[in-house]
Amino acid sequence: MTHDLIEKSKKHLWLPFTQMKDYDENPLIIESGTGIKVKDINGKEYYDGFSSVWLNVHGHRKKELDDAIKKQLGKIAHSTLLGMTNVPATQLAETLIDISPKKLTRVFYSDSGAEAMEIALKMAFQYWKNIGKPEKQKFIAMKNGYHGDTIGAVSVGSIELFHHVYGPLMFESYKAPIPYVYRSESGDPDECRDQCLRELAQLLEEHHEEIAALSIESMVQGASGMIVMPEGYLAGVRELCTTYDVLMIVDEVATGFGRTGKMFACEHENVQPDLMAAGKGITGGYLPIAVTFATEDIYKAFYDDYENLKTFFHGHSYTGNQLGCAVALENLALFESENIVEQVAEKSKKLHFLLQDLHALPHVGDIRQLGFMCGAELVRSKETKEPYPADRRIGYKVSLKMRELGMLTRPLGDVIAFLPPLASTAEELSEMVAIMKQAIHEVTSLED
């Protein structure tokens, strides 16, 4: 049966963000999971070192979450949210508003983080039209930014490897610099931050009359390599958006729900977004639910008699699905009863200490961390910061070695991403970092 399943997967499946030639050479099929480990069809266990793409909170098969889904199944699995609502979607909306930045008063459900961002872009665009400023149609995106894979989200993204092929499909956006301290000329966080803010201020000064919104990941640029923003940068962006009357869209899809040691990462700098996208950890990693938060001011710009054509015409079939909302409610109840955010903040200190051990490795150039979002950047030369040639695929080789040693993750180029489930114990964190260290050492030693 094992061989048969592998052959079927090779014959029929097309996996996301995967060169299928690589999969054919190194196939993997997961069968089950318990706690922070998953098991493949051969019975081998692996630490879930990237939280099943940055979303698992409590581990796999958390009884309370399993039971919440079963209980909701006894009532109804799904009904539409078009023109009506349902019980768990309504209850979840109230809970989400209670835990979100105080100026956000409305939630719009969707199925993925990319769609949540797409919705935010469309809301921002239509907001200005609805209030009589249709000339504000353009967007500012951050260099190296990533917001998902729909055409709108790609248009405000800036990762060449992912996005260049779709250039003719994308709408044009202005690109603003982001402080990548390790690769900056000075290497000084304050200087790097201030220079980037000056360039953003100049861009806004020249173009604010045509700009609807700025989109930015919250505190950490994830897909570009776990780039942690220097203190004061996100707050500085908020101040500039306010000064130049530009909406601020904050992407909390990866960073939200405790991942950075705050419920939402923008809380680190007391930033109040105009629109905010969230997803991933909202259901504890169980079902696909996402949400776009909006201020009351934005909501009211759409609230009018139907004939005035201010309705927000967006929505998908499974928006506000009861099973997803029910498990999200239980997930957030566990956040409170188990003090998840406080625990992550405390365990992050232990994790920081553990990660410092990687600095001793000759090809680890930089280690970046905010909460349970971590990245180790591998370089050919630690002294010059020279990267490995892309065709060496060092990050990919390290991830395969980690799999062999009993831990799953996915590299971001030559940055080894480490985003463990929030429920990971200190002992489990120590074991996972040890696997990272061994894999990096073994692979880079062979590449010298």
Curated annotation (Swiss-Prot):
Q: One Pfam family this chain carries?
A: Aminotran_3
Q: InterPro entries, alphabetically?
A: Aminotrans_3 (IPR005814), Aminotrans_3_PPA_site (IPR049704), BioA (IPR005815), PyrdxlP-dep_Trfase (IPR015424), PyrdxlP-dep_Trfase_major (IPR015421), PyrdxlP-dep_Trfase_small (IPR015422)
- Where N6-(pyridoxal phosphate)lysine occurs, the residues are K280
Keyword annotations:
Aminotransferase, Biotin biosynthesis, Cytoplasm, Pyridoxal phosphate, S-adenosyl-L-methionine, Transferase
Primary site of residence: cytoplasm
Record carries keyword Transferase: yes
- Its domain of life? Bacteria
Q: Which GO BP terms apply?
A: biotin biosynthetic process
Question: Which cellular compartments is it found in?
Answer: Cytoplasm
> Which amino acid positions bind substrate, per UniProt?
Y146, G315, R410
According to the UniProt record, what class of enzyme is this?
transferase
Q: In which pathway does it act?
A: Cofactor biosynthesis; biotin biosynthesis; 7,8-diaminononanoate from 8-amino-7-oxononanoate (Lys route)
Q: How is its activity regulated?
A: Inhibited by 7-keto-8-aminopelargonic acid at concentrations above 80 uM.
Q: Which GO terms describe its cellular component?
A: cytoplasm
The GO molecular function terms of this record are: adenosylmethionine-8-amino-7-oxononanoate transaminase activity; pyridoxal phosphate binding
**E.C. numbers:** 2.6.1.105
Q: Which residues bind pyridoxal 5'-phosphate?
A: G113, A114, D251, H316, S317
Q: Which reaction does it catalyse?
A: (8S)-8-amino-7-oxononanoate + L-lysine = (7R,8S)-7,8-diammoniononanoate + (S)-2-amino-6-oxohexanoate
Q: Which HAMAP family match?
A: BioA (MF_00834)
Q: Which family does it belong to?
A: Belongs to the class-III pyridoxal-phosphate-dependent aminotransferase family. BioA subfamily.
Q: What does this protein do?
A: Catalyzes the transfer of the alpha-amino group from L-lysine to 7-keto-8-aminopelargonic acid (KAPA) to form 7,8-diaminopelargonic acid (DAPA). B.subtilis is the only bacterium known to utilize L-lysine as an amino donor in the biosynthesis of DAPA.
* Family annotation (NCBIfam families): bioA
* This protein's name: L-Lysine--8-amino-7-oxononanoate transaminase
From what organism does this protein derive? Bacillus subtilis (strain 168)
Instruction: Point out the gene that encodes the protein.
Output: bioK
